[in-house]
């Protein structure tokens, strides 16, 4: 077990008085002083007597001792636990060895709704079934789940969110309410969104599984010959989901046409390979070594995927569990497959452990090539 925390924070403005002065000067330059007054000067009219001549005095009186909100600390200031567990078992006899292992890794994110978990199981067997007959098997299964933040844009919101709510928001409101509508509604250049709320509003998850197995069987016969048949199989499956509720910026910017959104994506693939080889080894007159390898190989792969994105979902409590409640925004699907057949011959000649001659002949046929040109 271990615990992680944010190693270093960005050096950002933390003095509220300086921050409000900066906002005022920016508002003056961009012509949005009334908007600034609404948020930081209790809505005082810009044409009121003493507005401009006394603005810095009012800023000092209100904000000289005001405490700031450290958004980096609020969002990333906690501790995240990482854990790892391993179990290994080895057993066997003189002719058979078996190894089993299980591994689990779990990591919580410093940011809420972010984590990663992975478990893996592996089995390995090597055995001499009979004299001159050998078997080897290697299998693995992985299961992985990653929770992310959906459309949450991370540091952008942390950096843009004001360190003070001025005279418009209390500190508690800044921390617990989605301020995006008020800021954006007052002035389009104010794109600040509460990073804590936005992170809760937009969530995502991706789960993936993988299974693979490799196996081979070897036969020694006629003293100098070895035949091996080997095969492998691999399967992958993944599912990804995302959902943004009524507190997300997408909903707040356009609650009617966009509303709450969600997506589901699925993909699956598998592949296999079968290889047959015949190997011949012989030494003549102690100096002449000959090795011949004749082989045949077949491989095939297939994959498919589908995804759907919906908008205008009416009920946040259903999340992405019932996409029929929303309107389809986009849908996709895909499918593909390919195969390869190969035949090969390799000859090696070694003289006196000093000179080597190699010759190779190979032919491949692929389903990806046009008909009539597949070899």
Question: Where do the language-model regions lie?
Answer:
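Outer-membrane beta-barrel channels and translocator barrels
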Residues: 82, 93-94, 130-132, 220-222, ...
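Surface-exposed loop/interface segments of Gram-negative outer-membrane beta-barrel transport/assembly proteins
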Residues: 1-68, 109-116, 120-212, 228-230, ...
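Conserved interaction-surface patches within small, structured recognition/assembly domains
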Residues: 82, 86, 106-107, 343, ...
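Outer-membrane beta-barrel initiation region
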Residues: 75-80, 89-93
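Transmembrane beta-strand segments that form the barrel wall of outer-membrane beta-barrel proteins
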Residues: 102-108, 357-369
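Outer-membrane beta-barrel architecture
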Residues: 86-90, 101, 124, 214-216, ...
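Extended, hydrophobic alpha-helical segments in both membrane/secreted and soluble proteins
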Residues: 121-123, 229, 274-276, 341-347, ...
């Amino acid at each position: 077990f271990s615990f992680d925390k944010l190693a270093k924070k960005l050096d950002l403005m933390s003095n509220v008085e300086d921050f409000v002065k900066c906002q005022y000067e920016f508002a003056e330059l961009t012509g949005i002083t009334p908007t600034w007054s609404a948020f930081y000067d209790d809505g005082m009219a810009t044409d009121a007597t003493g507005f401009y001549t006394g603005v810095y005095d009012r800023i000092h009186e209100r904000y000289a001792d005001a405490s700031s909100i450290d958004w980096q600390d609020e969002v990333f200031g906690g501790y995240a636990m990482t854990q790892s567990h391993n179990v290994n078992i080895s057993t066997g006899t003189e002719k058979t060895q078996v190894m089993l292992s299980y591994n689990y890794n779990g990591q919580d994110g410093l940011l809420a709704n972010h984590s990663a978990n992975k478990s893996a199981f592996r089995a390995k067997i090597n055995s001499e079934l009979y004299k001159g007959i050998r078997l080897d098997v290697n299998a693995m299964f992985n299961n992985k789940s990653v929770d992310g933040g959906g459309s949450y844009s991370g540091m952008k919101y942390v950096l843009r969110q004001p360190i003070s709510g001025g005279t418009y928001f209390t500190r508690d409101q800044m921390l617990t309410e989605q301020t995006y509508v008020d800021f954006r509604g007052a002035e389009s250049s104010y794109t600040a969104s509460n990073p804590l709320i936005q992170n809760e509003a937009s969530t995502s998850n991706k789960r993936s599984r993988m299974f693979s197995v490799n196996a081979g069987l070897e036969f020694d016969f006629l003293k100098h010959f070895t035949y091996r048949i080997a095969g492998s199989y691999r399967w992958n499956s993944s599912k990804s989901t995302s959902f943004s509720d009524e507190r997300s910026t997408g909903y707040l910017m356009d609650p009617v046409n966009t509303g709450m959104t969600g997506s589901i994506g699925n993909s699956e693939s598998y592949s296999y390979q079968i290889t047959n080889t015949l190997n011949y080894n012989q030494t003549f007159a102690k100096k002449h070594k000959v090795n011949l390898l004749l082989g045949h190989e077949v491989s095939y792969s297939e994959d498919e995927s589908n995804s759907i994105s919906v908008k205008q979902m009416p009920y946040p409590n259903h999340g992405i569990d019932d996409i029929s409640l929303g309107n389809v925004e986009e849908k996709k699907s895909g499918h593909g497959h390919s195969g390869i057949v190969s035949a090969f011959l390799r000859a090696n000649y070694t003289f006196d452990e000093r000179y080597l001659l190699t010759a190779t002949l190979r032919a491949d046929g692929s389903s990806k090539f046009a008909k009539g040109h597949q070899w």
